[in-house]
């Protein structure tokens, strides 16, 4: 299994891994309830940089400044060119792990796999 969040927050930046701190504690509790071994899963984020104020919208840019060829993330917001390598990293992690299930957690994670919401 692979679990894909959006971006690291304060605790994740300090620890250097996704889903630690308060959100990670809840995540671990839910995994335990479902009898899922976290160590057997890929746990990652769409991007490995922290968004200002932990607000994904603050990582995004206008269409004029967007990476060419990528769909809108949300209304009027696009991925900047400097974050495109993050999508490549995410793809490589997923390919290497070859999970039978990918759980996207958050709208940005859904976008990374499926594009903008219909």
Annotated model-derived regions:
Residues 1-118:
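A polyanion-binding, active-site-adjacent surface
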């Amino acid at each position: 299994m692979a679990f894909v969040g959006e971006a690291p927050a304060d605790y994740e930046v300090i620890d250097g891994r996704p889903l630690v701190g308060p959100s990670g504690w809840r995540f671990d509790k839910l995994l335990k309830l479902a009898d899922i071994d976290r160590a057997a899963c890929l746990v990652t984020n769409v991007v490995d940089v922290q968004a200002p104020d932990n607000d994904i919208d603050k990582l995004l840019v206008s269409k004029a400044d967007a990476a060419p060829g990528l769909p809108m993330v949300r209304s009027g917001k696009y991925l900047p060119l400097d974050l495109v390598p993050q999508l490549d990293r995410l793809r490589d992690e997923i390919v290497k792990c070859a999970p039978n299930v990918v759980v996207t957690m958050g709208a940005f994670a859904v976008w990374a796999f499926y594009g903008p919401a219909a």
